[in-house]
Every structure is written in C-alpha cells, then in structure tokens.
Amino acid sequence: MPAVTFTVLKRDRSTGARLGRLTTPHGTIETPVFMPVGTQATVKTMTPEEVAGLGAEIILANTYHLYLRPGADIIREAGGLHRFMHWERPILTDSGGFQVFSLADLREISDEGVTFRSHLDGSIHFLGPAESMAVQEALGSDIAMAFDECVAYPASPEEVAAGVERTSRWAEACLRAHRREDQAVFGIIQGGTIPELRRRSAREITALDFPGYGIGGLSVGEPKELMYSILEELQGYLPENKPRYLMGVGSPDCLIEGVKRGVDMFDCVLPTRIARNGTVMTTYGKLVVRNAAYARDFRPLDPECDCYTCRNYTRAYIRHLLKAEEILGLRLTTIHNLHFLIKLMQRLRQAIAEGRLEEVAADFYERYNSGKI
C-alpha cells in the first residue's frame, strides 16, 4: 500500500480549483491546505499543541537546518521527528536544496550534489540526492521532497535549462536511493519563468510517477502575474489524480490565485515571519501594529476575527508588548496570522464544495484591498 493516497472530491466548474483529501501515515489532510513552517522542528514562538489547536493539519520542517543541528542521527534516536517535537499529525520535509543554494556558502555543484559551507560554523558538508533521502528517512516525515536545483531569479535560459536537467537526474537518483515504505517522496518541477522549460520539467518529472508534485522556483522575486501564468501553463501537464504543492507561497492573494489554478498544498514562513516584525493580516488588509497610530487603539487586531488574540487583546496592548520586546507580543501576532490563513483555506474549501469560489474570492479581495483597517 502506498504511503500516501490522494482523492479529488470535487472540481470547481469555473476555475481549476479542486477539493481533495490526502491520507498519510499520521492522518488525513483536507485540501487545499496551508502548511505552517517549523524550520527547526518548531513553529516559532508556539507549542505544537497550539499549532494543532489552530486547525493546522500538517506542518513543514527543514532538512538543511535539522541536518546541521541537531543532526539526523539524534532525531532518529529520538524516534523520528514526530516524537522529537511532540507533533502527532503529518509532517512534510523539504529536501534541503533551496537552503543549500540560498543560505549556504556554495563550494561546488556537481552532478552528484552540492558541497557547501555551513552558515552556522563554516564546516564543509556534501548534500546530494542520496544524502537528502537518507536525512529525510531519518527524520521520518510523512512526505519527503526530492533533491532539486533551485536556480536564482533572474537567470539566463541556459542556467535554467541546466537546472531542469540536473533536477530531473537528481529526481531519478532520489527514487533509487529511497527505501522507507511509510514515507512518500514528491518530485519537484523547476524551469523558472520560461514556459518551455516548465513544460519540459513537468514532462520529465511526471514520467517518474511520483505520488505528488512540488512546483519549485516560484515566489523568488518574479512578478505575481508571471507566477500565475506559469501555474496556468502547468495545469495541463500535471496528473489530475495527484496532489500539487506550490512551494514557498503564503500571501492571501497568492493562496487564492494558486487554488484557482489547481494547487492543493502551500507552505511559507511569511505569516510567522511578518508576525514577529509586527505585521498582521486582517479582513481589511495588512496592519503594522508596531506603528504609533495604534498606541491608543483599543480594538482587536481584526474585529471580524475569532482567534485567541482577537478575542482577548487590543492593538494598543500588542503594540506595547512588541515595543517592549516581550515574547508574548510575538506569540499573539503569530497566533493571529496562522489562524487567519488556516481559516482562509477552510473558507476556500467550503466555497469549492458549494460552487461559490469566484464569489468568495471576490468578496475577500473587496474587503482586503479596501484599506478600512
């Protein structure tokens, strides 16, 4: 029996949106879904129980960071990532490829993998398809991602083509190396913003018959409209019966537009990162609660939100906490932002089920862009 199964429950008539169900060894996920990011085996400032209490059905953890610290062997000895961090629901791990190419001091890229210098202590490491699979098997995630080359944006067509070729070879190597039967491996489609190379990558990666597919190399600085056009381009090249995961995307508008274009899964550090900087998402747009304008504002962050933060605390109090550098301020803004996106995905799922996605999306945009904060 496969480690994961995916069922499309309903398709939207006017868009490419799908309502689905993804079953994993640690539970079932209703899609489309947003996955909070727990880079270091923790969603920053929150306990796993709190994250689950918000309705998060799956989280993401980072292979690169956990490989460097505390090390895959320690997590294996602990019984895997679920036991190590006390999270009983599904976990997806990325391959480490994006961080190797973006964070680490690259030493050498070869067909076998990447030699790099750790951003923590300068030590030299090698990570390739086999190594990435070994680390992710030790972590014991429900879904592992194939090791890929994420080419920076902008890049020349030659650089993007080389990345597509290497990503395809590495995808095959990942399948050869992977052994764990209770863990699925998703392939990753690259190709930058060049439609021809996206189509080529999609053909080559889907030919390997992974149980799911990540769409990588987007949301890296390209205009949003360009990302949307690439998603539209890919719809006809991805299997209808397998989940589609848009990597690193988490703003409300991108979630809605991704769902319309057939995406089932999303992850991003955005909601938690901007929360720690004092920015929150509300029904009527983004609110920078650190600003002096809110020093005497005794309303909740979002009067229409029912999260723990908005039920109990005011903008003035949260601003005070942030200015005083109190940890509670970071926790309260994080709770709110994650609640906001998880509730948004719940509304989108309900809208697909009821055949009202376009209507619900239009209503969201009208209010979110109104500026009535």
UniProtKB/Swiss-Prot annotation:
<comment type="similarity">
    <text>Belongs to the queuine tRNA-ribosyltransferase family.</text>
</comment>
<keyword id="KW-0328">Glycosyltransferase</keyword>
<feature type="region of interest" description="RNA binding">
    <location>
        <begin position="248"/>
        <end position="254"/>
    </location>
</feature>
<dbReference type="Pfam" id="PF01702">
    <property type="entry name" value="TGT"/>
</dbReference>
<protein>
    <recommendedName>
        <fullName>Queuine tRNA-ribosyltransferase</fullName>
        <ecNumber>2.4.2.29</ecNumber>
    </recommendedName>
</protein>
<feature type="binding site">
    <location>
        <position position="305"/>
    </location>
    <ligand>
        <name>Zn(2+)</name>
    </ligand>
</feature>
<feature type="active site" description="Nucleophile">
    <location>
        <position position="267"/>
    </location>
</feature>
<dbReference type="GO" id="GO:0002099">
    <property type="term" value="P:tRNA wobble guanine modification"/>
</dbReference>
<dbReference type="InterPro" id="IPR002616">
    <property type="entry name" value="tRNA_ribo_trans-like"/>
</dbReference>
<comment type="pathway">
    <text>tRNA modification; tRNA-queuosine biosynthesis.</text>
</comment>
<keyword id="KW-0862">Zinc</keyword>
<keyword id="KW-0808">Transferase</keyword>
<keyword id="KW-0479">Metal-binding</keyword>
<feature type="binding site">
    <location>
        <position position="190"/>
    </location>
    <ligand>
        <name>substrate</name>
    </ligand>
</feature>
<comment type="subunit">
    <text>Homodimer. Within each dimer, one monomer is responsible for RNA recognition and catalysis, while the other monomer binds to the replacement base PreQ1.</text>
</comment>
<feature type="active site" description="Proton acceptor">
    <location>
        <position position="94"/>
    </location>
</feature>
<feature type="binding site">
    <location>
        <position position="336"/>
    </location>
    <ligand>
        <name>Zn(2+)</name>
    </ligand>
</feature>
<dbReference type="GO" id="GO:0008616">
    <property type="term" value="P:queuosine biosynthetic process"/>
</dbReference>
<dbReference type="GO" id="GO:0046872">
    <property type="term" value="F:metal ion binding"/>
</dbReference>
<feature type="binding site">
    <location>
        <position position="148"/>
    </location>
    <ligand>
        <name>substrate</name>
    </ligand>
</feature>
<feature type="binding site">
    <location>
        <position position="217"/>
    </location>
    <ligand>
        <name>substrate</name>
    </ligand>
</feature>
<keyword id="KW-0819">tRNA processing</keyword>
<dbReference type="InterPro" id="IPR036511">
    <property type="entry name" value="TGT-like_sf"/>
</dbReference>
<feature type="binding site">
    <location>
        <position position="310"/>
    </location>
    <ligand>
        <name>Zn(2+)</name>
    </ligand>
</feature>
<dbReference type="GO" id="GO:0005829">
    <property type="term" value="C:cytosol"/>
</dbReference>
<dbReference type="InterPro" id="IPR004803">
    <property type="entry name" value="TGT"/>
</dbReference>
<dbReference type="GO" id="GO:0101030">
    <property type="term" value="P:tRNA-guanine transglycosylation"/>
</dbReference>
<dbReference type="InterPro" id="IPR050076">
    <property type="entry name" value="ArchSynthase1/Queuine_TRR"/>
</dbReference>
<feature type="region of interest" description="RNA binding; important for wobble base 34 recognition">
    <location>
        <begin position="272"/>
        <end position="276"/>
    </location>
</feature>
<feature type="binding site">
    <location>
        <begin position="94"/>
        <end position="98"/>
    </location>
    <ligand>
        <name>substrate</name>
    </ligand>
</feature>
<dbReference type="GO" id="GO:0008479">
    <property type="term" value="F:tRNA-guanosine(34) queuine transglycosylase activity"/>
</dbReference>
<comment type="function">
    <text>Catalyzes the base-exchange of a guanine (G) residue with the queuine precursor 7-aminomethyl-7-deazaguanine (PreQ1) at position 34 (anticodon wobble position) in tRNAs with GU(N) anticodons (tRNA-Asp, -Asn, -His and -Tyr). Catalysis occurs through a double-displacement mechanism. The nucleophile active site attacks the C1' of nucleotide 34 to detach the guanine base from the RNA, forming a covalent enzyme-RNA intermediate. The proton acceptor active site deprotonates the incoming PreQ1, allowing a nucleophilic attack on the C1' of the ribose to form the product.</text>
</comment>
<feature type="binding site">
    <location>
        <position position="307"/>
    </location>
    <ligand>
        <name>Zn(2+)</name>
    </ligand>
</feature>
<keyword id="KW-0671">Queuosine biosynthesis</keyword>
